[in-house]
Amino acid sequence: MLGARLKITVYERQHRSALLDLTCCSRWVHKHLDWHETGQWLDGGMGQVLLAWNDDKLEGYIGLSEPIAGWSWIRLLGIRDGTMPGMVVRELCEAAEFRCAEQGISNIVILMTTNWLPAYFRERGFSHEEDLITMAHIGLQLPPAPTVSARIRRAQEPDVAAMAAIDRLAFDAPWQLADYDMRQAFRTATSATVATLDDEAVAYQLSTRQEEIGHLARLAVHPAHRRKRIASALLHQMLTESKRRNLTELSVNTQLGNWQSQRLYERYGFYRNGYDIELWRKQIR
């Protein structure tokens, strides 16, 4: 039985095992780390993590990303089985929101990846902001390659800083990648290419693979170089490489309101597969 109030503390290294054990053993878990494993994210200090205690028992945790342009993601959330999730979520969120306000963070967002999240976050004042849709491609039949002045080549480690800079210009908050996310995305990508003009990177793509299924994780073009078919060239090259690797299916996520992105993918044979994820937001006063 939970007490009237939980004790909220800041995560420290000594709590690592308890947090990971709760993550593995509970059904009340949300994880949105993209390219990172939970332990890796914790060890890298890539955000702030708060813990909820009932005496010496860990009842829950919440992990928020480092802010970008005043926005922070809820990357981790876990509640111990057998507790009252609503109470734990409420107290963790109250503490997280207070810390965010102190740090000048204006918005907290979360992807509704599991069906138990919406009810509790609605109570906390979060609301549906937009949808992240999934598009799939089967068969890998390609239109002719576009003619572009940009050169497409494999990305190298020295390109990562330029890729991160392009990403921040190409996307609005909260969709921009932090530098550490870009570095990890590059390390784990099956395919990473950049488009250059006069030896300067102006666009990039990152793709991953799991067995015979590929995923276009990121595609971004510097705003000054849009409408030059560079995105089409990067996509065509990625699809050609995927076909060479005998991938049977590809997927990509994009925002429901990003019609330009959707039209590009549709031209190359992608279609919406119905797997949409809601993004919820709370503005911190």
Where are these regions (language model features)?
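Conserved acetyl-CoA-binding loop-helix of GNAT-fold acetyltransferases
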Residues: 85-98, 221, 227-240, 244, ...
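Conserved active-site alpha-helix within GNAT-family acetyltransferase domains
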Residues: 113-130, 228, 232, 256-274
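Short amphipathic alpha-helix that is part of the acyltransferase structural core
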Residues: 1-34, 132, 145-174
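C-terminal "cap" of GNAT-fold acetyltransferases
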Residues: 133-156, 248, 253-259, 267-285
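Conserved hydrophobic beta-strand within the GNAT/NAT acetyltransferase core sheet
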Residues: 108-111, 216, 250-254
